[in-house]
Amino acid sequence: LAGDGCPGDGDCSPIDSLTLDPDDPSQMIMVAVTVTTAQDLYHVMLEDAIPSGTEILDTTLLTSQTATEDDDPRRPFENGWGWWIFNPVQIFDDHLLWTAEFLPAGTYILTYQLLPTHRGAFQVLPARAWQYFYPEVQGSSAGDVFTIE
């Protein structure tokens, strides 16, 4: 978990607590999940559970006035490389799920935003990745405790 604007700013310092500002109801938490694989993998699934006290911000819903930029076909890598490898993220109430039919060897950073809603100390479950047809190939991150004050 990181503060506002993590991936684009180059400073992705992890945070383990957040103080809610009553004057700023739009505070966001940027979550970055890093996946590294030494070899090509098939049928990969990556699941990341969100901590209680937060909600996933679904940017695919057109419910706000945020402006989105169209992709420029003359500059396909302007927003990074490899965005087409993963299928669209599946958003559930308590977790997100990314899938990929083929994942070339390398390092990938998957990001999403959380909206803190309740104060308290909450357990962050480990993110986990596995090959769907080869469950013996799997990995997970570390769990943590996240505090919203």
Regions found by a protein language model. Give the residues of each.
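C-terminal segments of large proteins
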Residues: 1-149
